[in-house]
Amino acid sequence: MEITGIKVEASVLNQLGNDFALKLQELEHKIYQQAGEEFNLNSPKQLGHILFEKLNLPPIKKTKTGYSTSVEVLEQLKMKSPIVSEILDYRQIAKIQNTYVKGLLECIQPDGRIHTRYLQTLTATGRLSSVDPNLQNIPTRTDEGKQIRKAFVPSTKDGYIFSCDYSQVELRVLAHVSGDEHMQEAFKSGYDIHAHTAMKIFHLDSPDEVTPLMRRHAKAVNFGIVYGISDYGLSKNLGISRKQAKTFIDNYFEQYPQIKDYMDKAIKEAREKGYAETIMHRRRYLPDIHSKNFNVRSFAERTAINSPIQGSAADIIKIAMINMQKKLDELHLKTKMVLQVHDELIFDVPKAELDTIKKIVPEVMQSAVTLDVPLIADSNWGHNWYDAK
């Protein structure tokens, strides 16, 4: 993948850069109008003066140098004045412009491709890391961020970028290692796991009663549990009371009792052995599991719970990558595996091979390992990475 690289259209990035520059100018104009004066938007000191002294917004946090204008602070203020939302938008687009548009343009090699490097030993969990540049963190949460993917294209004119992504692989691993019958049943039946969990923690009779907000809360609980989240952490994430967050967590363990048993057992075994291990028996040593410092020990305990989950997910996609390359070689295909983004594999596919790839990639990924629940991989394709989503 490093040698092959992925083709990136500089013209698309340049056009996006022009579009973002216009948006930034418009936002600047609006912000200056509301502030009643021009100032340096990139200066926290000047921004703090405008927001908290001139516009009299309530200061939430102070630093050694003055008012904090961090994203966290601005998020809490955005309902109080439209200028705050515009400042947040400005920062977001400016970051995309500088980090991704300008940053990626500098990384395009003479062959028209970007050749990222993958580090196998940077993360403690075993996941691959992409550097020089990092192509695993192209933004997906904002429309402007997603646009960057339009520049990533196939190497042939009528070819495709093909993406195949494991569906909720960490939760499927959790269902497998914990042996929890209720969670396994949900995956075997093909239920939407977040809607299913919402049904359980809100004590509903049917998935039809689950609202989008309930599903969002259940999703935060599902993923939070994997990371050993506390009621305080969940309350902060969801903007709810600690009491309500505790109720969600208690209801979760009531509905999935074997997950609680797994967590207790994972900590106990880590104390006895000094390490946690993945389903492929790859170990992560945890010397801090016996620390006398509560915070240090608690982190090691959460790591004992989480490492077998995240680490096994990393093992699974690496096995899939090895098997996939063998399959491409065996069938003498010209398709190239060009990127790995956590639970997703991305391919550069000639038009003539698309039907073959649509069939074999999900098959190979879903059969990488055998779990007590099915592994599911979802495929999409298009004439660029943006359209393959």
Placement of each model-derived feature along the sequence:
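Conserved, non-catalytic sequence blocks in retroelement Pol enzymes and Pol-derived host proteins
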Residues: L41, A186-K188, I309
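Amphipathic, well-packed alpha-helical segments that form the structural scaffold of globular domains
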Residues: Q25-Y32, F52, N56, A175-S178, ...
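Conserved catalytic core of nucleic-acid polymerases
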Residues: H115-T116, T121-T123, H203-L333, L339, ...
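C-terminal polymerase-core module
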Residues: L22, E26-H29, Q33-S85, E254-N306, ...
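Short beta-strand->loop micro-motif that forms the acidic, two-metal-ion catalytic signature
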Residues: E344-V349
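Function-dense linear segments that define catalytic or interfacial modules
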Residues: Q120-P207
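Short beta-strand
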Residues: F39-N42, K336-V341
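Conserved "right-hand" nucleotidyltransferase catalytic core of DNA-directed polymerases
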Residues: M1-D143, T156-Y160, S167-E170, D231, ...
